[in-house]
């Protein structure tokens, strides 16, 4: 429980000082709802329009511009990061439907209420993404015509393709 207390303290400090106070956030309920949404959907493609539709279905009618601003606040505080998709055949970055990962899986697990049994693959993918960044790679998500490669990693002239799987 000491570990969870520490993680909870870090989370509250980041939320209060790095996000709420720094950006003069007034809609704290939405800030929390959006972070819960991101925590629940790590490693999945997202679009601001789809998030807006989901939030509206939950009784929170928020403009996509506001969602983009709040997402940027999270990114600036290093709570989350987004990863562009890379068209492997066309060899170009795609601007839509990025993926989102947490900077710290412990913080993510705190938000969703602990490690959940069905989350192992999402959490593993998040951990691998963070490790690839620590190793100095520039990381994108590989887009194929009929699927995706979890990560396309580039460092200098080296390119590595990584697929994360819990069970094969």
Predicted regions and their residues:
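Accessory nucleic acid-recognition modules appended to NTPase machines
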Residues: 2-159, 166
């Amino acid at each position: 429980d000491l570990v969870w207390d520490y993680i909870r303290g870090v989370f509250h400090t980041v939320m209060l000082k790095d996000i709420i106070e720094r950006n003069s956030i007034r809609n704290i309920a939405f800030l929390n709802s959006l972070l819960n949404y991101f925590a629940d959907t790590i490693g999945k493609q997202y679009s601001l329009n789809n998030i807006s539709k989901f939030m509206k279905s939950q009784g929170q009618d928020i403009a996509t511009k506001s969602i983009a601003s709040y997402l940027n606040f999270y990114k600036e505080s290093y709570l989350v990061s987004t990863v562009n998709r890379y068209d492997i055949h066309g060899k170009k970055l795609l601007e839509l439907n990025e993926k989102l990962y947490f900077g710290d899986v412990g913080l993510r697990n705190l938000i969703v209420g602990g490690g959940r049994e069905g989350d192992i693959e999402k959490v593993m993918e998040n951990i691998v993404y963070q490790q690839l960044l620590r190793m100095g790679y520039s990381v994108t998500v590989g887009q194929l015509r009929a699927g995706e490669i979890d990560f396309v990693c580039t460092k200098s002239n080296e390119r590595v393709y990584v697929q994360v799987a819990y069970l094969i």
